[in-house]
Amino acid sequence: MLEVLLLALALAADAFAASIGLGSTHKSDVNSQFMKMALLIGVYFGVAQGVMPLIGYALGSTMLGWFAEGASWVAFVILVALGIKMLYESRSVNNDETRINLSHKTLLSLAIATSLDAMGAGFTLNLLAVNAYLACLIIALTTAVLSVLGAYIGRKSGTWLGSWAEALGGLVLIAIGVNMVV
């Protein structure tokens, strides 16, 4: 279960970083408007991060029989590649992008974009001794909570914290991948 919690935290890092950026763009001083926006961010990101690994899990279940012996190595490659991608993206974030139009279309696009990594990670859930549905629920709830928290942090701190969160998430994915083959 520890692996699921670490995976949830790592996968939530993209959404957390994006939420910090979105929170930093909030112009209104009205707390109720900000709270609504933060909760909406949490719902969009949480649902996307919960559904994508489920899709990956379903695809992985289908394909697992085809390469059962090498499955741990495939999971290793996927998680390490995703981790390296997150590390790279954390260094190439443009922190000057501070004004974003926060429509439902924008939130949906960001939620899908930040959850694509979760689909790849969901593929590896077949290799962990966990209930995949419970794991996806944990991933969704973790992402939702961290996204709301990220929006609040972004409102107070600006965007500088987002890239560090994404880098940490990348390192955790790499560590989980290495653990699967050790």
UniProtKB/Swiss-Prot annotation:
Subcellular location: Cell inner membrane
GO terms assigned for molecular function: manganese ion transmembrane transporter activity
Cellular component GO terms, alphabetical: plasma membrane
InterPro entries for this protein: ATPase_P-typ_TM_dom_sf, Mntp/YtaF, Put_MntP
Main location: membrane
Membrane topology type: Multi-pass membrane protein
Pfam families named in the record: Mntp
SUPFAM superfamilies associated with the record: Calcium ATPase, transmembrane domain M
Protein family membership: Belongs to the MntP (TC 9.B.29) family.
Protein name, per record: Putative manganese efflux pump MntP 2
Species assigned in the record: Psychrobacter cryohalolentis (strain ATCC BAA-1226 / DSM 17306 / VKM B-2378 / K5)
